[in-house]
Structures are given as C-alpha cells and as structure tokens.
C-alpha cells in the first residue's frame, strides 16, 4: 500500500517538473515563422529528364532550343474621331402640381348614450434618487506617482531571478521524486 502511495506521489512530482519546466516569462511570444515557399514557375519550361540508372557512359546532352519569338503584332488602325454628343433639347420644366384645398370635416355628433369608462388614478412614476444623478465623487486622496510605478508590467525583468527560482524548484522536485522512487523500491 505504501509503495502505491509513494509511486503516485513520485509521478505527481514528475508531472510538476515537466509542467513547470518552462515558465511563461521564458516561453516564446511569437510562433516560429515558416520558411517561404518558392513560387512555381508559370512559364513553359522543359521538364527535366527522368533519372536514369548509373552507367559508365556519360549521357549525351541535347541542345536546348531557344523559344521561338512571336511575330510582331500589326499596329492598330487609327480610330475615327467621334464628334461630341449633340446637346440635349431643353425641355419645359413641369410646374408643381396644385395642392387641393382640404375639405372641412364636421365633428361627430354627440350621442345620448355615453360609454362608461373606468377611471384609473394614475400615480406619477418614481424618479431616480438625486444621488444617482450626480457623478461619483473623486477619492479623498488620489494615488500619486510612487515607487509602485517604477516597475511597469510592460517592462521585462532582465535580472534573471525568476529563471533561477524556477530552476531551483525543478531541481528540488526532481530530488524529491528520485528519493521517493529509491524509498519505494
């Protein structure tokens, strides 16, 4: 039973060693860039000959033919000059349509039978408290520049103290793991 416990604790220590092996401060920030791919040539080229088995005679090289030049294209014929477009005829601008006079609509006549409606007493909605309408008060003592601003989170720590502490922790965990393995067996 004790061997199982010691083995479990040892495995846990080994896991801590491997997980803590690289601290986030030393981890790479950018992923490695891939090498650029060579673009495939788009011009028609003579494909290389298939590899031939080794022979004692040197293969004869065929002369490479130069590409045939295309015949010069004929000069385009001069285009006829186009006359400017004819001015558009001036059209009479239509006048605005006349507005029809509105007819007076008589009010509906009152009837003897009146519908009974329920009257509700409407209470005004409560408004927000006056304290909520004003902006918050500034703190009594605003923090001024002090020693806490000396180390900003953007500045990298170049002292190496963190690396040393991580290495010490890894060595300690490895020593504990090995001692537990020795005690277990």
Curated annotation (Swiss-Prot):
Tissues in which the protein is found: Predominantly expressed in open flowers. Also expressed in leaves and stems, and at a lower level in roots.
GO CC aspect terms: plasma membrane; side of membrane
Organism in which the protein naturally occurs: Arabidopsis thaliana (Mouse-ear cress)
Alphabetical keyword list: Cell membrane, Glycoprotein, GPI-anchor, Lipoprotein, Membrane, Proteoglycan, Signal
Subcellular location per the Swiss-Prot or TrEMBL entry: Cell membrane
Post-translational changes noted in the entry: O-glycosylated on the hydroxyproline residues.
Residues with a covalently attached lipid (GPI-anchor amidated serine): 159
InterPro entries the record matches: AGP9/17/18
Name assigned to this protein: Lysine-rich arabinogalactan protein 17
Keyword Glycoprotein: yes
Region: Disordered, residue numbers: 25-160
Gene name tied to this protein: AGP17
